[in-house]
A protein has these predicted regions:
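Short, Lys/Arg-rich, polar N-terminal cytosolic tail immediately upstream
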Residues: 1-22
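Membrane-water interface of transmembrane alpha-helices
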Residues: 2, 68-79
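Juxtamembrane helix-capping/reentrant segments at transmembrane boundaries
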Residues: 22-25, 82-99
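The first (N-terminal) embedded transmembrane alpha-helix
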Residues: 25-46
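Core segments of transmembrane alpha-helices
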Residues: 34-36, 97-108, 147-150, 195
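Membrane-interface helix-boundary motifs at transmembrane edges
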Residues: 48-52, 80-90, 112-117, 183-187
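Alpha-helical transmembrane segments
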Residues: 52-67, 125, 155
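Membrane-embedded catalytic cores of phosphoryl/pyrophosphoryl-handling enzymes
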Residues: 116-212
């Protein structure tokens, strides 16, 4: 089989399964997973003691992430949400308020436990990002997927250097997936990604670089 025919066959396969691929991308590169991965990688790489950072993350990530996620799953089971990504803007306010309240309580707990500053900085940034997106959601639907992957990609490149630029390819990939699934318009994805990129810059230049 020639290279050209292989490319055509692959393109046809993708075209015939594009919705399934978009759904898979949305699940794998979801805000929950992206947030955990970027926090773990940067905290372990740039923390003073990688083992200590890993220990803190093993404690804090389940405490911070699991209760809101289980709450969303419960709302889906109860028929109040279509899925955990809250596609209907009118149903987002209550879950987002609960998530904001929970993360705020976790920040108080993190401060009380005297967790490393870089770990606290990441969770504080997550709180601020969700807060900004929640305020926008009061008036207009915006892409949390786009904001999260854009913030993570920006922070990664700023911390790791130019070799990490390919990470930014995930931003349009996630954007395409959300648009293909008709969960967002291109404008909603664009502005979500823009807010995420700004938060990534603030996270790195405003917090992390001052802690290293």
């Amino acid at each position: 089989m020639s290279l050209q025919s292989s490319i055509k066959k692959s393109a046809k396969l993708i075209k015939n399964n594009d919705e399934r691929i978009a759904r898979w991308i949305s699940h794998v590169i979801s805000p929950h997973i992206v947030g955990v991965v970027i926090t773990a990688v940067v905290a372990i790489k740039f923390g003073d003691n990688p083992l200590e950072m890993l220990w803190w993350l093993l404690i804090l990530v389940p405490i911070v992430v699991l209760p809101p996620l289980l709450y969303l799953l419960w709302l889906v089971h109860a028929g109040e949400l279509e899925d955990i990504y809250m596609p209907d803007r009118s149903t987002r306010l209550r879950p987002l308020t609960v998530m904001m309240g929970w993360i705020f309580l976790c920040l108080l707990l993190i401060r009380y436990w005297q967790a490393p500053a870089i770990v606290e900085a990441f969770f504080l940034s997550a709180f601020v990002l969700i807060g900004i997106l929640s305020l926008v959601t009061l008036f207009w639907k915006i892409s949390f997927h786009g904001a999260t992957i854009s913030a993570a990609a920006t922070a990664t490149v700023m911390m790791a250097g130019s070799w990490a630029w390919p990470v930014f390819l995930l931003v349009p990939l996630v954007g395409w997936a959300r648009i293909r699934l008709e969960r967002h318009t291109p404008r909603q994805v664009f502005y979500g990604s823009l807010i995420g990129a700004l938060m990534g810059l603030i996270l790195v230049y405003g917090l992390i670089l001052n802690l290293l």
